Amino acid sequence: MILIAGPCVIESRELIMKVAESLRKFNEMSGVEFYFKSSFDKANRTSISSFRGPGLQRGCEILAEVKEKFGYKILTDIHESYQAEPVARVADVLQIPAFLCRQTDLLVAAASTQAVVNIKKGQFLSPQAMKHSVEKVLQTRSARAYTPQSGAASSDTKAAQNSARSSDTEICAAQNGAQGGANDGSSALGAQNSCGARSGVQNSAHACDASSAANSAQSASQPSGEGMHDLARRYGVWLTERGSTFGYGNLIVDMRSLPIMREFAPVIFDATHSVQMPSIGATSGGDSRFVPYLARAAAAVGVDGFFYETHPDPAHALSDGPNMLNLQQLERVVAQTLAIQKALGF
């Protein structure tokens, strides 16, 4: 099971080192692939006066220190295309924020590195629509030699390093194979769009973004097939569920989205942002009481990993305090989800 945990934002070097020290047990836990998470810049804060973090250079220095001292794999988010290459020198996983999950240039820039790309599902999107974001990364990486760095990826690196033509053929074959189970023509349309890509990054991005709204609606009744999930795992593409907009200032989690998205990529469940209440006044609110309940529900449905923002004193955190899990609660929640997944054979 993948476990991603850490403070929302790098508040200070001292806080990050304190939290990193407290998380040692998870890096040594059997059956857990641990990633330390924190953001160097919260570029999407509600208010211009809200704390954003230390910035790219200092933030990456602190994350690099965590990596060197504790041996942790690192996950952090990027908001602009130019950030992908320098951040990937430190981070094992580049995270695409939910609000930016359709931004082709950002996805292509992240895919052009050797880091795993974790795409958070937009609160405004259906789970089926996330297939197109995955395709953008797959098409970009099929035009390059890509070697997975994460243990969550397949060890079949030889196939991942094939020529652009053979990789494109494989992706298209996987999506065409999905059509046999769907019988509605939608997967064939998606495959046709994918097969139109060329080795150039720009052409790849354009081909993957060519699906129409009508095609998305048609495919909603049946997700893509198993082959695409395997390709996403090998090429280092994850999806993260973090709730869906439910009126103003509220989110809900439709657990059906987990198996739907898992048809075409490994899926992480973000239990902390799922209890967020966006834009309550000048900051976002939330209710962390519900984190354990949603995490256990997701474990019962079956996911590839969990994402928890955690803090020693959430009430005084500089970002996302109301929905962060107290460090003292994290071990119990992780143990419960592991037990559920083990009991159900996930």
Question: Which residues are covered by each model-predicted region?
Answer:
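Short, well-ordered coil/turn segments that N-cap beta-strands
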Residues: 1, 30-34, 68-74, 90-92, ...
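N-terminal amphipathic alpha-helix/helix-capping segment at the start of soluble metabolic enzymes
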Residues: 1-4, 345-346
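Glycine-rich, proline-tolerant flexible connector loops at the mouths of alpha/beta enzymes
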Residues: 7-13, 35-56, 310-320
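Active-site-adjacent loop and "lid" segments of alpha/beta metabolic enzymes
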Residues: 49-57, 95-100, 248-255, 274-299, ...
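Alpha-helix-loop-beta-strand connector modules within alpha/beta enzyme cores
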Residues: 52-74, 110, 114, 258-267, ...
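Catalytic beta/alpha-barrel core
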Residues: 55, 72-80, 92-105, 116-127, ...
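Catalytic alpha/beta core domains of metabolic enzymes, predominantly
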Residues: 114, 118-143, 227-310
